[in-house]
C-alpha cells in the first residue's frame, strides 16, 4: 500500500499516472475507513481526493502554501502528508487526528486552524502579502468550495487578492453543493460557467480581475495535473475552477449528497446506520426525540396559521430540522441564505421591521461570525426577530474551531437583546411562542443541548422584558441558580445537599442577559452562599453578573462554568471535572464555603 509509505507528499513526484490513480483509490478507501468508524465529513472529502493527489504532485508543499477553507476537504491532504495512520488504524489512532486543518497537529503542512467557512482566500492574501514583502517565490494556493463562496469574507478576500495583483491561486472546488443545495445569485454564474465549460460571456471571476481556467473533469488526475502545472508560478491572481462530484467513489454518498455531507459512523458495505458492533450485531438504541425535529414540526404547524412566520437558516438547515421535504412544505416561509450569518442577522432585522416574524436557527459556534450585525443592525433597532441558538454548551461540537461555549458572554454583552434559557421542552416552546408574538425587542433562545427533557409541571407563557427568575424550591443558607441545560445539574446538586442536611433554594433564572434584582436582593435575608451554574464560558457570563450584583455585600458567590479557553476534542466528563462541575465536586465546594 502506497499511502502507508508516504511521510511527505514529495513521495508522489516519483510516481507515474497509473500509480497516482492507485494512490487516489487507496486514499479514498482510507477516508471511508475513517468516517465509517469514527464519523466525520464524508462527501466533501471524497470529491476532492484526485485534486489533492494532483496538487501535491504538482506543487511543492511545505514551501508552497495550501490554505483549506472550512477544512471539509482536508482528509486526503492529511493522508498524503504522513498522517495515514489516523485513517487506517483503530479508533484511538483516529482520535489523534483532527477533522480539521490543524497546525498544532502538523505545523509543516497545515498552515491554519480552520473550521469556519469563507476564510481561505483572506488567509491566503496575508501569506501573499508576506511573500511579496520578503521577496520569496512560493505559490500561495487557497482552496474553497462553491458553497463557501456565499460567505461575505470570500468576497472580501477576492477583492483584496485582485488589489494586490500578484501571484495567488484560488482553486474553486465546485461540487454544486453547500451542505445542502446552494443559495445565492452567484450560483447562476457558476452554473453558466459549468454549462459553457468556462467560456460564457459573463464571468464573475474575470470581473474581479482574475485570470481564469475551467476544468470539467475535476475528478480526473491527469487533467488536474495539466491545469495545475499551467498555473504554477503565476504572477497574477488566478482562479482554477474545477467541477467535482460530492461523494465521488461511494455510491450512497453520491445518491444523497446532503445527508452524506457529514455523518456518524456507518456500515461501509451499504452505508446503513447504526454501525454494527465488532461481532456483527446491531446496537440497540431507543428512538430519541431531538429539538430539530420538534422545532421544525412545530414551525410547520404554526406556519399554516401565521403566513408571516418565516424559518431562516444560514447554510445549515439540518440544525433547524428542516429536511428537504420540510423545506418544500414550508415553501416561501423557509429561506436559507447560504453560509452568510452576517446577512442572516441583518435580514431578520429587516424582516421584522417589515412586519414578518422571522426565526433564525444558528449554531452557537457561528454566532461569533455575526456579532456586529446582531448588535448594530438588530438590537440597536429593537426589531423583534427571534434567534434560535442550538448546540450551546459542552454537549455539542468539541473541535477547537467549533466549541460552543461563548454564546452567553457574547450575546449577553449586547444591550437590547433578551436571551432566554429554557430548561425543558415545554418551557422552550412557551418561550418560543412568546418571543414570536411579542413586538418590542429581539429575543434569543438557547435551545437545551442536554437532550429533550419534559416536565409535567405548568410553565409560564408570558416572559416580559425585565428578567424574572423562577424559584422552584425555597430553602435557606444556600441558593443554586442553574441556567438552561445545567438546570438538571442544579437539581442533582440540591438533592445531594439534602443528603448532607442542607435545604438549598433552587432557582431557574430563565433570563441570561440580566439579573433579577428583586430575587437576588431577597436572598440576602436568609442565605450565605449563591451558586451559579451555566453551560458555557463563565468569563463574562451569566454567573459573573450575579457575582457583580452582590459586590461588596456579605453574600458569597460561587460561579460555576467553564474557564475561558480553546479546548480541542475534549471529553465532556473530563472538561467538567477539570472545571469542578461534576455534581459531587460542586457539593464539596459548597460544603467548604458554608
Segments (PLM) and residue ranges:
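Glycine-rich ThDP/TPP pyrophosphate-binding loop and its adjacent helix/strand module
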Residues: 110-266, 272-274, 284-288, 293-295, ...
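A short, small-residue-rich loop immediately preceding and capping a beta-strand
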Residues: 40, 64-67, 113, 134-151, ...
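Acidic-glycine-rich active-site phosphate/pyrophosphate-binding loop
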Residues: 19-30, 80, 84-106, 314-329, ...
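A glycine-rich helix N-cap at a beta->alpha junction
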Residues: 87-97, 163-177, 379-391
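Peripheral docking tails and interdomain loops at the edges
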Residues: 271-282, 396-398, 418, 537, ...
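Non-catalytic terminal/interface segments that mediate subunit docking, oligomerization
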Residues: 65, 250-368, 373-383, 482-484
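Cofactor-binding active-site loop characterized by glycine-rich and histidine/acidic residues
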Residues: 41-164, 309, 323-324
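Glycine/charged-rich beta-loop-alpha catalytic/anionic-binding loops adjacent to active sites
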Residues: 29-36, 96-113, 135-141, 323-337, ...
Amino acid at each position: 500500500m502506497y499511502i502507508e509509505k508516504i511521510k511527505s507528499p514529495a513521495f508522489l513526484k516519483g510516481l507515474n499516472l497509473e500509480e497516482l490513480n492507485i494512490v487516489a483509490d487507496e486514499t479514498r478507501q482510507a477516508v471511508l475507513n475513517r468516517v465509517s468508524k469514527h464519523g466525520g465529513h464524508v462527501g466533501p472529502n471524497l470529491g476532492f481526493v484526485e485534486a489533492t493527489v494532483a496538487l501535491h504532485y504538482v506543487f511543492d508543499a511545505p514551501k508552497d502554501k495550501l490554505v483549506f477553507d472550512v477544512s471539509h476537504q482536508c482528509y486526503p491532504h492529511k493522508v498524503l502528508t504522513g498522517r495515514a495512520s489516523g485513517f487506517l488504524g483503530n479508533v484511538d489512532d483516529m482520535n489523534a487526528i483532527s477533522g480539521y486543518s490543524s497546525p498544532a497537529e502538523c505545523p509543516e503542512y497545515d498552515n491554519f486552524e480552520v473550521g469556519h467557512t469563507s476564510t481561505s482566500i483572506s488567509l491566503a492574501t496575508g501569506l501573499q502579502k508576506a511573500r511579496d514583502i520578503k521577496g520569496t517565490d512560493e505559490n500561495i494556493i487557497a482552496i474553497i468550495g462553491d458553497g463557501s463562496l456565499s460567505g461575505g469574507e470570500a468576497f472580501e478576500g477576492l477583492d483584496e487578492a485582485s488589489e494586490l495583483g500578484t501571484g495567488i491561486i484560488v482553486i474553486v472546488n465546485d461540487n454544486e453543493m453547500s451542505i445542502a443545495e446552494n443559495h445565492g445569485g452567484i450560483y447562476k454564474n457558476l452554473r453558466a460557467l459549468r454549462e459553457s465549460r468556462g467560456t460564457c460571456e459573463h464571468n464573475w471571476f474575470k470581473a474581479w480581475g482574475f485570470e481564469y481556467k475551467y476544468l470539467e473533469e475535476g475528478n480526473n488526475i491527469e487533467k488536474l495535473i495539466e491545469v495545475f502545472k499551467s498555473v504554477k508560478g503565476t504572477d497574477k491572481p488566478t482562479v482554477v475552477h474545477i467541477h467535482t462530484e460530492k461523494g465521488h467513489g461511494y455510491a450512497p454518498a453520491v445518491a444523497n449528497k446532503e445527508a452524506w455531507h457529514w455523518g456518524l459512523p456507518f456500515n461501509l458495505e451499504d452505508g446503513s446506520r447504526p454501525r454494527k458492533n465488532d461481532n456483527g450485531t446491531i446496537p440497540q438504541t431507543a428512538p430519541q426525540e431531538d429539538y430539530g425535529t420538534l422545532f421544525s414540526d412545530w414551525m410547520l404547524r404554526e406556519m399554516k396559521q401565521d403566513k408571516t412566520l418565516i424559518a431562516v437558516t444560514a447554510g445549515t438547515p439540518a440544525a433547524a430540522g428542516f429536511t428537504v421535504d420540510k423545506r418544500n412544505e414550508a415553501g416561501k416561509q423557509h429561506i436559507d441564505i447560504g453560509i452568510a450569518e452576517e446577512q442572516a442577522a441583518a435580514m431578520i432585522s429587516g424582516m421584522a421591521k417589515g412586519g414578518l416574524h422571522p426565526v433564525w436557527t444558528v449554531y452557537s459556534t457561528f454566532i461569533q461570525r455575526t456579532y456586529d450585525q446582531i448588535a448594530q443592525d438588530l438590537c440597536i433597532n429593537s426589531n423583534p426577530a427571534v434567534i434560535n441558538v442550538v448546540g450551546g454548551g459542552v454537549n455539542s461540537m468539541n473541535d477547537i474551531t467549533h466549541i460552543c461555549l461563548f454564546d452567553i458572554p457574547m450575546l449577553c454583552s449586547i444591550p437590547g437583546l433578551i436571551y432566554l434559557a429554557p430548561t425543558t421542552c415545554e418551557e422552550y416552546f412557551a418561550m418560543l411562542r412568546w418571543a414570536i408574538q411579542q413586538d418590542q425587542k429581539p429575543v434569543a433562545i438557547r435551545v437545551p443541548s442536554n437532550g429533550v427533557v419534559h416536565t409535567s409541571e405548568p410553565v409560564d407563557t408570558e416572559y416580559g422584558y425585565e428578567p424574572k427568575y423562577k424559584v422552584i424550591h425555597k430553602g435557606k443558607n444556600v441558593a443554586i441558580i442553574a441556567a438552561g441545560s445545567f438546570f438538571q445539574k442544579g437539581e442533582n446538586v440540591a438533592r445531594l445537599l439534602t443528603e448532607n442536611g442542607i435545604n438549598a433554594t433552587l432557582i431557574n433564572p430563565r433570563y441570561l442577559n440580566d439579573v433579577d434584582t428583586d430575587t437576588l436582593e431577597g436572598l440576602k435575608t436568609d442565605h450565605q452562599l449563591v451558586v451559579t451554574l451555566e453551560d458555557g464560558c463563565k468569563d463574562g457570563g451569566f454567573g459573573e453578573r450575579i457575582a457583580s450584583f452582590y459586590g461588596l455585600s456579605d453574600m458569597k458567590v460561587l460561579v460555576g462554568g467553564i474557564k475561558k479557553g480553546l479546548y480541542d476534542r475534549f471529553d465532556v466528563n473530563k472538561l467538567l471535572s477539570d472545571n469542578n462541575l461534576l455534581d459531587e465536586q460542586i457539593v464539596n465546594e459548597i460544603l467548604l464555603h458554608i
